[in-house]
């Protein structure tokens, strides 16, 4: 079995969705078993925040990781890109409190990763997790679950009153072959951009959120349709929800072999499921055909 890290460092600068502040991110290769973690290089002592479920401190409209009073928010797109492209170990240096939104998708991160390439890292005694019984979390009619399955698959459904979105479903599988999985993620999931509803934007801005949001980095939908077409996919919104789910579940460290099924879910429910998977323990089932 193998892990992977970057063959060279990556640097990106951009504005945060909620803070509206420009930050710089440097992603550096790291040793086998180090995992993915953030370093706040703008603060004394360079505090480290691991990209783990236990570090989640906030889940309203994005996923935030924290350690004490130090935090990094809106981590999900970057973490989805790293995990979807097979980067297990990475030091993510950031000079502010929010990861740049870039174009609202994970495409820029994915292109950067593909450009520098990966380095294989042999691993001994790594035992992956297989889900052997259904694990559910729900709130009202929204839910997310992990079901026993022969492969790692993500399926998502959304439903909005706006005709341009309506009811959408999409399903995507993560093959055990790294090259095929990365290509599939880059083509089918990474390009899907974050989206918002026109009638909610003013309220969110009044509450101090989406200060960095614009028609250049987020799709906006109103009663008459999309304000900034064209879409990259007819079902781009639900594909973006899979992107968010991949990013949130990457906090497990590696994806269990399971079918992750979600409907009208949220970052909060995603993280609740991840925690529940951890609560089951990593010894209730084993598998030997996991790609990480």
Swiss-Prot record:
Superkingdom of source: Bacteria
EC number(s) on file: 3.5.1.108
Reaction(s) catalysed (UniProt annotation): a UDP-3-O-[(3R)-3-hydroxyacyl]-N-acetyl-alpha-D-glucosamine + H2O = a UDP-3-O-[(3R)-3-hydroxyacyl]-alpha-D-glucosamine + acetate
Classification via Pfam families: LpxC
Biological process annotations from GO: lipid A biosynthetic process
GO molecular function per UniProt: metal ion binding; UDP-3-O-acyl-N-acetylglucosamine deacetylase activity
Alphabetically ordered keywords of this record: Hydrolase, Lipid A biosynthesis, Lipid biosynthesis, Lipid metabolism, Metal-binding, Zinc
InterPro entries for this protein: Ribosomal_Su5_D2-typ_SF, UDP-acyl_GlcNac_deAcase, UDP-acyl_GlcNac_deAcase_C, UDP-acyl_N-AcGlcN_deAcase_N
Cofactor(s) required, per the database record: Zn(2+)
GO CC, alphabetical: membrane
Enzyme class: hydrolase
Disulphide bond pairs: none
Active site: residue positions: 267 (proton donor)
Keyword Magnesium assigned: no
Entry annotated with the keyword Metal-binding: yes
Pathway membership, UniProt: Glycolipid biosynthesis; lipid IV(A) biosynthesis; lipid IV(A) from (3R)-3-hydroxytetradecanoyl-[acyl-carrier-protein] and UDP-N-acetyl-alpha-D-glucosamine: step 2/6
Binding site for Zn(2+): 77, 240, 244
NCBIfam families for the chain: lpxC
Matches recorded under HAMAP family: LpxC
Similarity remark: Belongs to the LpxC family.
Role this protein plays: Catalyzes the hydrolysis of UDP-3-O-myristoyl-N-acetylglucosamine to form UDP-3-O-myristoylglucosamine and acetate, the committed step in lipid A biosynthesis.
The protein, known as: UDP-3-O-acyl-N-acetylglucosamine deacetylase
Organism, scientific name: Nostoc punctiforme (strain ATCC 29133 / PCC 73102)
Gene field: lpxC
